[in-house]
A protein has these predicted regions:
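Non-catalytic, conformational "gating/processing" segments within enzyme and secreted inhibitor domains
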Residues: 73, 116-272, 294-377
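Conserved short hydrophobic interaction patches
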Residues: 105, 283-290, 319-326
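Internal alpha/beta scaffold segment
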Residues: 271-297
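C-terminal soluble interaction/assembly domains
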Residues: 347-414
Length: 414
């Protein structure tokens, strides 16, 4: 089985100067906006809160808890790793309390530790697995930017930097860059650019891999899936019995599907009946590492998992503010390391695409590789785990202890 996961993340900054309204925030650009945007951010600061977990990957689960708690869509896909990378780039230009809040939100002790995280430095390009991160900074040639900001992002994040006129031709160039760095899956993220736009920062994350244990497509059957509202829908349910990592507690059951030729594991998590996805995310925030360690003693599992795909687009602005990163989004922002002109973040956007099926587009001979500390002690009788109601997933890089992607599946047929 192969899965593909593509993500496009943008960071949007704005000048505090009063000019005309900004264009579509989904473009993720630095531009001039109304002061009304600043005032709205200031208002939101006082009414949005969420628990921040000082645990490994606490940032990821805080995002997941917040988004699953407020999102009306049944299927969610976010990338904490991509968000962190985009914020790490802009953090190189943040100063004083603005920088402190960014670091605190990301659970980073210092800017140096944030810039030097291993996940940024270990792209995987094996025969069956590919994980790449790409960063770019597009600067309006009329916008002055400090050389040290550019130098730091080239050094730590290998950012491609281009000083160009912001017009339709540049928009096409940016779209082509995104297409090239997402294997053609995300092609059109900028409709138009003009001189009100000052800078566009983009992080693209592309992941493709084959399961160690494929599903037999002939075993896939039409079966009912009960949605959160109690109604049912018919899904393509994949089946196999395998030896893999499994664990449970009083609140959830979780099973891992390792990706061949890598240290990437995909965890599928089934909360107990009656538990919301937001409650399950909060439980994972403080128990995920413990549950993972307990799961390293493998079990025979009879697994039933629906085939699904997700296309998702969201703003992370509200979530980040709720985590305490407030100054960056209003007139208190200090991005003096980017420019002497006052700037603040207008938005942080993500576009994601995830597809999981039995084989994938490039299914071939798969090399089975075990993680070194996985103790194989299977039980005699397989444990049955059936994902026939809403569940969570977490895609991890166990080598760097990073959460690449996470989200929920509430309707596999969407």
């Amino acid at each position: 089985m192969k899965f593909r996961h593509f993500i496009y993340a943008t960071l949007l900054l704005a000048s505090c100067a009063t000019t005309k309204d900004a264009t579509d925030a989904a473009q993720g650009v630095i531009k001039d906006t109304h002061n009304s945007s600043v005032n709205a951010a200031q208002e939101n600061k006082n009414r949005m809160t969420i628990k921040r977990y000082n645990t490994p990957n606490g940032f990821a689960f805080s995002l997941l808890e917040y988004i699953t708690g407020k999102e009306t869509q049944e299927n969610i896909c976010i990338s904490p790793a991509s968000a962190e990378c985009a914020l790490a780039m802009v953090a190189n230009g943040a100063r004083e309390r603005t920088l402190e809040q960014i670091l605190s939100t990301l659970n980073s002790k210092s800017l140096d530790s944030l810039n030097n995280k291993e996940i940024y430095k270990q792209p995987i390009k094996e025969s069956g697995t590919k994980l790449t991160l790409a960063n770019s900074i597009w600067v309006n040639k009329k916008q002055p930017v400090k050389e040290q900001f550019i130098a730091d992002n080239k050094k730590y994040h290998n950012a491609y930097v281009s000083n160009v006129p912001f017009n339709d031709n540049t928009a096409s160039t940016i779209n082509e860059w995104c297409s090239q760095n997402t294997n053609g899956k995300i092609n059109n993220i900028v409709d138009k650019l003009d001189d009100k736009t000052k800078m566009l920062l983009i992080n693209a994350l592309y992941l493709k891999g084959a399961w160690m244990d494929e599903f037999n497509k002939n075993a896939t059957t039409d079966e009912p899936f009960t949605k959160a509202d109690g109604t049912t829908t018919t899904v393509k349910m994949m089946h196999q019995t395998l030896t893999t990592s499994y664990n449970l507690d009083n609140n959830l059951r979780m099973i891992s599907m390792p990706i061949a030729e890598s240290y990437i594991w995909v965890w599928f998590i089934l909360p107990r009946k009656g538990m919301s996805m937001s409650e399950a995310a909060a439980h994972l925030a403080t128990n995920f590492n413990k549950l993972c360690k307990g799961a390293y003693h493998s079990q025979r599992v009879k697994l039933s998992l629906p085939r699904f795909s997700i296309e998702y687009k969201t703003s992370l602005k509200e979530s980040l503010m709720a985590l305490g990163m407030t100054d960056a989004f209003d007139k208190n922002a200090n991005f003096g390391g980017i420019s002497d002109k006052p700037l603040y973040i207008d938005d942080v956007m993500q576009n994601t695409y995830l597809k999981i099926d039995e084989k994938g587009a490039e299914a071939a001979a798969i090399t089975h590789v075990s993680v070194g500390y996985l103790a194989m002690r299977p039980t005699k009788e397989p444990i049955e785990v059936k994902f026939d109601r809403p569940f969570l997933y977490v895609i991890t890089d166990v080598m760097t202890n990073s959460i690449l992607f996470t989200g929920q599946v509430g309707n596999p047929t969407e």
